[in-house]
């Protein structure tokens, strides 16, 4: 009997597919630290000091490094990349990042304390919400098939204005996939850019949920339990 061999994790497969979709559109891959400063994780993104996302029950704060958190999203990485692009005079620019994020929350079939998030941003002149919807529609069709049902709904986030949420049909119900919108003027100011000159679209959501729909995996927690049934990938 032959020995079992290791295989690429489905989330690694999906990460590479997602990167390919966006690099084909001209996006650059951005990387950043998992141990993030409060400034980039919250302040840059116009998150108020009293916002519940900053609470201990939602965020892992690091006692040994005051003012640092385990990043709750990779939007912080996109903010860093856009800030550097502005300093180097490389605008227009577009960035994509996939990485581990951490939330101090209860787990269930669609929520986990650690998961992979995909975040992106595009900055330049004359960028609109129509561009954002076009980019995201293209992405989900490439990842989930041309017949995937996608819906955009108005929402609110402190770092975007206007804001939308993206939903996909899964098991006959709408599953929230991503938050997105046009960067709030304060976000652009915080990274040293002029909101009267530049517009920026931002989007971010769980990579794990895309995998659940793509491969019919019923529980997000399976990805992190060493389940041997994932060997099929």
PLM feature spans:
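TRNA-recognition modules of translation machinery and tRNA-sensing kinases, especially anticodon-binding
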Residues: 2-233
């Amino acid at each position: 009997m032959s020995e079992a061999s290791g295989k690429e994790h489905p989330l690694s497969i999906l990460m590479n597919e997602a990167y390919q979709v966006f690099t084909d559109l001209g996006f650059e891959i951005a990387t950043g630290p998992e141990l993030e400063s409060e400034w980039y994780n919250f302040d840059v993104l116009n998150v108020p000091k009293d916002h519940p996302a900053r609470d201990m029950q939602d965020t892992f704060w690091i006692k040994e490094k005051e003012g640092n958190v385990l990043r709750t999203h990779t939007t912080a990485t996109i903010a860093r990349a856009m800030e550097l692009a502005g300093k180097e005079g490389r605008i227009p620019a577009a960035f994509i990042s996939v990485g581990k994020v951490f939330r101090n929350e209860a787990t269930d079939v669609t929520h986990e304390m650690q998961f992979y998030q995909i975040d992106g941003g595009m900055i330049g002149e004359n960028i609109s919400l129509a561009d954002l919807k076009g980019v995201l529609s293209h992405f989900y069709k490439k990842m989930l098939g041309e017949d995937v049902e996608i819906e955009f709904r108005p929402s609110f986030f402190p770092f975007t204005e206007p804001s939308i949420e993206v939903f996909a049909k899964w098991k006959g119900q709408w599953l929230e996939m991503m938050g997105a919108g046009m960067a709030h003027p304060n976000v652009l100011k915080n990274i040293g850019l002029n909101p009267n000159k530049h517009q920026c679209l931002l989007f971010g959501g769980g990579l794990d949920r895309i995998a659940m729909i793509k491969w019919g995996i019923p529980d997000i927690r399976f990805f992190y339990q060493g389940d041997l049934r994932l060997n099929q990938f």
